[in-house]
């Protein structure tokens, strides 16, 4: 599985744009990240991003949200809220009142300990897939 996205952090001191490519395979997860200037972002929005596996990738959706971070020991928690999913081509959008909580820690962390600390139901969730399901026409 591969994710190709341009990302920004508008409500932080980080004013950069990033081209992120995330690969998930049986060997593990790998992420590359390249800083882009606004001119490159505009170019990629119009011309697309060429990928050897997928060809030219054009933007489909914007996903906008607020993110808060917390640390509990060696566990990082991110909470996403005020999510807005927007179809790039049609400008239709979906406001989502859900909260998305993500927990990250080192691979050495014992899963049983995590389940005791955070007794939530675990689900796999993709903001992009949610946008596809709710905004595709």
Predicted regions and their residues:
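Phosphate-end processing signature that detects enzymes handling 5′-triphosphorylated RNA
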Residues: 1-137
């Amino acid at each position: 599985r591969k994710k190709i996205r341009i990302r920004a952090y508008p409500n932080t001191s980080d004013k950069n744009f990033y081209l992120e490519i995330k690969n998930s395979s049986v060997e593990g997860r790998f992420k590359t990240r390249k800083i882009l200037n606004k001119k490159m972002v505009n170019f990629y929005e119009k011309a697309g991003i060429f990928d050897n596996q997928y060809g030219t990738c054009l933007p489909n959706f914007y996903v906008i949200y607020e993110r808060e971070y917390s640390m509990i020991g060696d566990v990082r928690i991110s909470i996403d809220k005020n999510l807005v999913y927007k179809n790039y081509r049609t400008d239709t959008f979906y406001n989502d009142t859900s909260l998305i909580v993500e927990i990250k820690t080192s691979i050495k962390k014992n899963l049983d300990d995590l389940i005791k600390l955070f007794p939530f139901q675990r689900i796999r969730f993709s903001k992009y897939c949610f946008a596809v399901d709710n905004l595709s026409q």
